């Protein structure tokens, strides 16, 4: 390999005409900045289209970076993390080239794909491929966009992914200077410069199509609204098996439902084991289920505190309820009424 001295020596040995041309080229490069060579994209292995520079200073196509971001928010070369808002505010190496390509020459044709509330223009490379296939009379053309293979149906003027035919998007061929949203997912904002299509709060597909932020928020809020609406709204069940008020029933209301005077309130707390075991248990069995669901508002003195009273109160309560039975129902109730003896066994009265 030649050293630097040898290279300098070989250059100095050139004819004066050659040296003059070289000097003029150097002076021209110092006086005006020539067009930089288009860098190669390490993702698509082609020359970059709308090249963007990541914070790690690696350069890729904008759509290639967008397609890679669906897998991970990291650089494809050094694996350094890419900022979350990079696709919204990309660092373009040649923003003027994007604007020039978006305007084009009057009368030139360009290809567009349908977005939400407008049309997006394909990038220059894809437009050339579509125009070439269209001029040759081909029915379909394949395109590599953001790492995905798309098929353009030039007869029906739709595009779709090659492995997913269900989702179709309209395409069209029109003049280049029609109103449009942007080029290849990059918005042409005349006031604030060029922005990514996600800058307006949009979720973007791989090919640069957009979805409005309102639709995304509504879709995200729909499950929450459904969950709120689907909450059980049944009224709380009272101890007597009848619907109560939305608030916790008072002790007097509960006693009134059972036809017990307030003076017998201390004895009421133990209904369920003695006299009412055969009749009131079915209605009481639904109360624990209702309480477990959390749909009823139960006070502390009406739920779990029924099994802590002395046995004497249970006996007195059973006897008082037997005495208060209706006169006409003595014969029928005597066979079904039970009481608990001190030995813990239930016997018929």
UniProtKB/Swiss-Prot annotation:
UniProt entry keywords in alphabetical sequence:
Cytoplasm, Metal-binding, Nucleus, Transferase, Ubl conjugation pathway, Wnt signaling pathway, Zinc, Zinc-finger
Instruction: Give the main location.
Output: cytoplasm
Disulfide cross-links: none
An annotated GO BP: protein K48-linked ubiquitination
Acidic residues composition bias: residue spans: 298-307
Q: What subcellular compartments does it reside in?
A: Cytoplasm, Cytosol; Nucleus
Q: Where is this region: Disordered?
A: 1-21, 226-251, 264-349
Q: Which domain of life is it from?
A: Eukaryota
Residues of the WWE domain: 97-173
SUPFAM superfamilies according to UniProt: RING/U-box, WWE domain
Q: State a single Gene Ontology molecular function.
A: ubiquitin-protein transferase activity
Q: Does the keyword Zinc apply?
A: yes
The RING-type zinc finger ranges are 41-79
Q: Does the keyword Cytoplasm apply?
A: yes
Its pathway?
Protein modification; protein ubiquitination
Instruction: State the GO CC annotations.
Output: cytosol; nucleus
Compositionally skewed regions (Polar residues) per UniProt: 283-292
The task this protein performs is described as: E3 ubiquitin-protein ligase that specifically binds poly-ADP-ribosylated proteins and mediates their ubiquitination and subsequent degradation. May regulate many important biological processes, such as cell survival and DNA damage response. Acts as an activator of the Wnt signaling pathway by mediating the ubiquitination of poly-ADP-ribosylated proteins. Neuroprotective protein. Protects against cell death induced by DNA damaging agents and rescues cells from G1 arrest. Promotes cell survival after gamma-irradiation. Facilitates DNA repair.
What is said about the domains? Answer: The WWE domain mediates non-covalent poly(ADP-ribose)-binding.
Q: What name has this protein been given in UniProt?
A: E3 ubiquitin-protein ligase rnf146
């Amino acid at each position: 390999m030649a050293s630097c001295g040898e290279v300098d020596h070989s250059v100095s040995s050139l004819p004066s005409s050659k040296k003059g041309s070289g000097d003029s080229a150097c002076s021209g490069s110092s006086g005006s900045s020539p067009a930089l060579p288009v860098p190669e994209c390490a993702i698509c292995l082609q020359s970059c289209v709308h090249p963007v520079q990541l914070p790690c200073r690696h350069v890729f196509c904008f759509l290639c970076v967008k397609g890679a971001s669906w897998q991970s928010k990291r650089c494809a070369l050094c694996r350094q993390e890419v900022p979350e808002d990079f696709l919204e505010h990309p660092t373009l190496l040649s923003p003027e080239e994007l604007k020039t390509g978006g305007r084009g020459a009057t009368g030139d044709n360009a290809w567009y794909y349908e977005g939400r509330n407008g049309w997006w223009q394909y990038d220059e490379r894809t437009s050339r491929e579509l125009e070439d296939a269209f001029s040759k009379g081909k029915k379909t053309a394949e395109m590599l966009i953001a790492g995905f293979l798309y098929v353009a149906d030039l007869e029906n003027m739709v595009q779709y992914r090659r492995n997913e035919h269900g989702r179709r998007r309209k395409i069209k061929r029109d003049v280049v200077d029609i109103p449009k949203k942007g080029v290849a997912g990059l918005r042409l904002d005349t006031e604030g410069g060029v922005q990514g299509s996600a800058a307006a709060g949009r979720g973007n597909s791989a090919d640069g199509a957009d979805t409005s932020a309102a639709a995304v928020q509504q879709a995200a809020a729909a499950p929450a609204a459904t969950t709120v609406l689907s909450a059980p709204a049944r009224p709380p069940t009272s101890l007597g098996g009848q619907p109560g008020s939305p608030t916790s029933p008072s002790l007097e209301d509960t006693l009134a439902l059972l036809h017990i005077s307030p003076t017998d309130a201390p004895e009421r707390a133990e209904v369920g084991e003695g006299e009412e075991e055969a009749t009131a248990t079915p209605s009481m069995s639904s109360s624990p289920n209702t309480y477990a669901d959390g749909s009823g508002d139960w006070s502390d003195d009406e739920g779990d505190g029924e099994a802590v009273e002395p046995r004497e109160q249970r006996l007195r309560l059973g006897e008082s309820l037997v005495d208060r039975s209706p006169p006409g129902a003595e014969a029928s109730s005597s066979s079904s009424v039970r009481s608990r003896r001190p030995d813990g066994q239930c016997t018929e009265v």
